[in-house]
Amino acid sequence: MNSPRISQPGEDRGAPPLRRRTFMMTTAAGAGMAAARSAAAEDSAPDVDSPSQGTQPTQLTVNGTHHALKLQPRTSLLDLLREQLGLTGAKKGCDHGQCGACTVHVDGRRVASCLTLAVKTDGCAVTTIEGIESADGTLHPMQQAFIDHDALQCGYCTPGQVMAAIACVREGHATSDAQIREYMSGNLCRCGAYAGILEAIREAAPVMRRLEGRRHA
């Protein structure tokens, strides 16, 4: 038996009759085509989360060791050091470049490694807290000064503090207490060990100048 005809207000009586079965079949077919188009679009979209998607060859030297890597452009230097190279001295504090816990040196300059793209260090020399002691295991003068002056409590910020302090001396910004405070202001210590940090830098600065001056003589 035919389905009852659906009447539409104001319809043209000369048009072919629209029946319920025809309406339902047409609607179902349209929905199926829309779903197929959506699935095809999803299949053709790039997989932005794929580990191999858009990697970039990068070569850098970390603490004297050469590394040839394929990195995603969005990988930070901090994540490369900690998660791929196993160098966990640099800490992820704020991950916004505001605390200094992730400070490392790139070609001798201090940087916030959480804000530095790893691919931007291609061809560079990176030094972390793990790479500043002498070959015979002797601590760097700044490390020893931090120990001698109790310039730490929990120790979480200490690697970044030490790396920033070394750079502060090498930049020539450790000639007065006021200057040290100014140029170390980007490194925060939640434990409040600032007095010890200041004393450590004050003591280590002439030792560093003497040793490094002798090295370059």
What do the PLM-derived regions correspond to, one by one?
Residues N2-A217:
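Signature of N-terminal electron-transfer/Fe-S-associated modules in redox systems
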